[in-house]
Amino acid sequence: MKKLVFLFIFLSSNVYLDNLNLLCKGTIGWVIEQDFGEMSMTLNLNLAEKTGDILLPPQLVPYMVRDKGNKFFFEDLKITDDEITGSFVLTKTGVIKSISNITLSRITGQINYTNRYRQKGFQGNCTKIEVDKKKF
């Protein structure tokens, strides 16, 4: 019986210790009708520490910061059983921050990306990347 209790505690505590790596494929929406085709973004999350980063497609990165790359770190990441939400600074000019937000359903895998000051958004579906199972 003691072994069962230990096993249960060990397994339940490891649920949130794993990193979650996601590949999200979808489309970019824009006020001006323009078809970019299917795009992808990658999320790397540490569920235990509630930290992570997002790798945006170039079409979602403003020209003024493209030379810094397309990887952004979450400042605010909230994780529940049903949903993951997060925000990060896309650009910062003086005291003005352009903050982007993601909402990810842990049930359906659907992701929504929005930015308050930019008119582009992203909507798609995410699948888990098994980093320990390499394709090549």
What name fits each language-model region?
Residues 58-99:
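Contiguous, well-ordered beta-strand patches that form the walls/edges
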Residues 2-13:
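Sec-dependent N-terminal signal peptides
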Residues 39-70, 110-118:
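N-terminal glycine/threonine-rich, aromatic-flanked beta-hairpin/loop signature
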Residues 101-105, 109-125:
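Short, exposed beta-strand-loop hairpins at the edges of beta-sheets
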Residues 123-136:
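Short, low-complexity, Pro/Ser/Thr/Gly-rich segments in the mature regions of secreted, periplasmic
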Residues 20-56, 80, 90-104:
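Short, solvent-exposed loop/hinge segments that bridge or flank secondary-structure elements
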Residues 14-23, 134-136:
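N-terminal helix-cap/turn-to-beta initiation motif at the start of protein domains
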